[in-house]
């Protein structure tokens, strides 16, 4: 099982946590949503929950709950800039399709 970050994602998450002034890391999860079934969830973590798995890459801790891990195993979190837009991108080898708007996916 693994979750990784690109260098740009690790730098961005580290900066967010530093600006926030606290936090163990970043929670990566999935929830039921959208036309394809699942959507990604990103949020700061101050405390671990039972069943959480902690991955560390490039000095950043990524926390994943047990239910989400099966859908996220092998995912790389990237941070990309395209023109005036920038944001996190999920390179997930488990997805079989995405909705047209890019907000949700299925496995």
UniProtKB/Swiss-Prot annotation:
* Signal peptide (from-to): none
> Any idea which positions bind Fe cation?
35, 99, 101
Gene Ontology BP annotations:
iron-sulfur cluster assembly
Protein name listed in UniProt: Iron-binding protein IscA
Is Protein transport among the key words of this record? no
Subunit structure as annotated in this protein's UniProt entry? Homodimer; may form tetramers and higher multimers.
User: Which InterPro entries does the protein's record reference?
Assistant: Fe-S_cluster_asmbl/transfer, FeS_biogenesis, FeS_cluster_insertion, FeS_cluster_insertion_CS, HesB-like_dom_sf, IscA_proteobacteria
What NCBIfam families does the record point to? iron-sulfur cluster assembly accessory protein, IscA, PRK09502.1
Q: Which UniProt keywords apply?
A: Iron, Metal-binding
The organism's place on the tree of life at top rank: Bacteria
Q: Which PANTHER family match?
A: IRON-SULFUR CLUSTER ASSEMBLY 1 HOMOLOG, MITOCHONDRIAL (PTHR10072:SF41), IRON-SULFUR CLUSTER ASSEMBLY PROTEIN (PTHR10072)
SUPFAM superfamilies per UniProt:
HesB-like domain
Q: Function, please?
A: Is able to transfer iron-sulfur clusters to apo-ferredoxin. Multiple cycles of [2Fe2S] cluster formation and transfer are observed, suggesting that IscA acts catalytically. Recruits intracellular free iron so as to provide iron for the assembly of transient iron-sulfur cluster in IscU in the presence of IscS, L-cysteine and the thioredoxin reductase system TrxA/TrxB.
Q: How is the cofactor bound?
A: Binds 2 iron ions per dimer. The dimer may bind additional iron ions.
Give cofactor(s), names only. Fe cation
Its family remark reads: Belongs to the HesB/IscA family.
Gene Ontology molecular function: any one: iron ion binding
- GO-annotated cellular components: cytosol
Q: Where are the transmembrane segments?
A: none
